[in-house]
Structures are given as C-alpha cells and as structure tokens.
Amino acid sequence: MAEAELPDEAQLGLRLPETRAQRPSGFDLETWAAAARFDIPERAASFIQRVESAAEAYVVRELFRIPGVLYDGGASVYYHGAAIRLQVPASVYRLDLVVQFEEIRLAVEIDGLEHHGLTQAQFARDYYRARRLMIGGFVVVRFTASEAMTQPRQCWRDVFAILKTRSSIERLA
C-alpha cells in the first residue's frame, strides 16, 4: 500500500487498545499486526512491543525504515546521535515518544479523537499537560493519530526538522 493509502483502525476493523491495561488477556501485538496486514521489521519487534496505539506502531515502524537508524535491542533507537525512546515516564505523565539530542528533549505525543474527546475539560487538560512538560524542559510535538497512520515519514521529517532548528548540529537529516 502506498503511504497515503494506509488504512485506519476503523477500516481494518481492528483496534489496538489504547493502553496495555486495556489489552485483553492473551493479546499479542504480532497477532494484531498480522491480522491488520501490518508488517513489523524483524529488528524492530522488541522495540515496537512498547507501543500503546496503532498510530504509534505506524510511526515506530516508519522509524526503522529510515536509513541510518541504529537499534541494539535495548530501550532506545538512535539516529545521528539522537536517542528515541517509547513510553517514557516524565513526572506524573507518560510520554508516547521522547527524542533527545544533547540537551534538547522533544516530547512527541500521538493521539486520536477517541483519546481526547471533544470536551472542553480534556482540551484544558491537554494544554495544562503541555505547559507542565515545557516547564520541565521539553519541546512538545503533537501529531494526530490520522497523521501518524497516513504520513508517518512526514512525522519523522517534522520531528528531526524541529530538532535540527534547536541544535547547532547540521548533521541531522
């Protein structure tokens, strides 16, 4: 499938539970991926197990398709000196992804409407959370689940462009 033609969860009829706690007993990401015709690169299998949504899985899978990405089987993936981690605790929050290069820390959040809802209270909580993260030294980068699933490569381009503009290093692609 071409990148712009990737199906969303509703089209697949398969929904990856939002959190691990919501996953039914015996839930297996690889079984979900096979049913969703979602190929997981072999070297990414242990890292991608940490995702908590289908949208995150699309973005992480795309990360492993970028030339120059290094992964040794641990908690981080590396790209030109930047460390990328999944489900990172930060104060009372857990961040979908953290991309860190030297002192620069990006908090990458990927959420769909089902997570946020359309209530004023949730909207206010999201803005409050973003401010707390910024006070803690993070640059907050947000993507919709739709963007992550249909344009995962562009999400990474944006992340690395933001990182590049905040660093003096020109080697980041």
Where are these regions (language model features)?
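Solvent-exposed, charged helical/coil patches
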Residues: 1-82, 171-173
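A short, structure-level motif marking secondary-structure boundaries and short turns
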Residues: 43-46, 113-116, 164, 170-171
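Conserved phosphate-coordination/catalytic loops
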Residues: 53-54, 88-89, 120-124
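Residue-level detector of flexible, active-site-proximal loop/helix-junction positions
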Residues: 78, 114, 147
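Short beta-strand-loop-alpha-helix junction that forms the active-site gateway
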Residues: 94-127
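Short, basic, helix/turn surface patches
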Residues: 103, 159-173
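Catalytic cores of nucleic-acid endonucleases
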Residues: 118-163
